[in-house]
A protein has these predicted regions:
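Accessory RNA-recognition modules of RNA-modification enzymes
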Residues: 1-181
């Protein structure tokens, strides 16, 4: 197709990070406007409606200010990434394409610290392990960062050292929380 995006790494399509990534950006915008029209028809039976053109971004990558990333063991190593589309197979990633690059850096730093402190990633099959997900938010204007460790239980061995180390690397981190799930 002449509207195919040739620049996108296939890993992003396989992970579902960039569902429309196979389309050139102007075609993505047209697709989204058509989705609105189709939804109005499907939900409300409205057919005679003008839908304005979808407004695009100057740079349609590296814009998301929040990431929720699963933590799993892949080939014996603790990894962060995204699940392969329609599965629970983790695809290790360091560059998440649509996320703020600083968020990607914080996730990689946390991954490395989790490895260093030998904290166990969650294993769905065995229903065991400690760390399920990492959630990182970054203020677009303030640059402040929030980190949330999603764990299976309240106690996290050496969590104080882990927090101290990640804040040393990223002084913009202003809050660290734990979500027990």
């Amino acid at each position: 197709s002449p509207h195919r995006n040739q620049d996108l790494d296939l890993a992003y399509l396989r992970s579902g990070i960039a569902d429309l990534g196979h389309l050139a950006y102007p075609e993505q915008l047209k697709f989204k406007a058509k989705q609105v029209k189709d939804s109005l028809y499907k939900i409300a039976g409205i057919t005679d409606v003008d839908v304005a053109d979808t407004l695009g971004m100057e740079n349609p990558i590296k814009y998301r200010n929040k990431a929720q990333v699963p933590v799993r063991r892949v080939n014996g190593i603790l990894e962060t990434g995204f699940f392969r589309k329609n599965s629970h197979d983790l695809m290790p990633l360091e560059d998440f394409y649509i996320q703020d690059p600083v968020i990607d850096q914080v996730i990689v730093a946390l991954r490395d610290l989790l490895r260093r402190f030998d904290l166990k990633p969650y294993d769905e099959k065995e229903q065991s392990g400690l760390i399920r997900n990492l959630v990182v938010r970054r203020g677009h204007h303030s640059g402040q960062i929030m980190v949330i460790l999603v764990t299976t239980r309240p106690k996290v061995f050496r969590v104080e050292q882990l927090i101290e180390q990640v804040i040393k690397q990223f002084p913009e981190i202003v809050s660290v929380m734990q979500n027990i799930n």
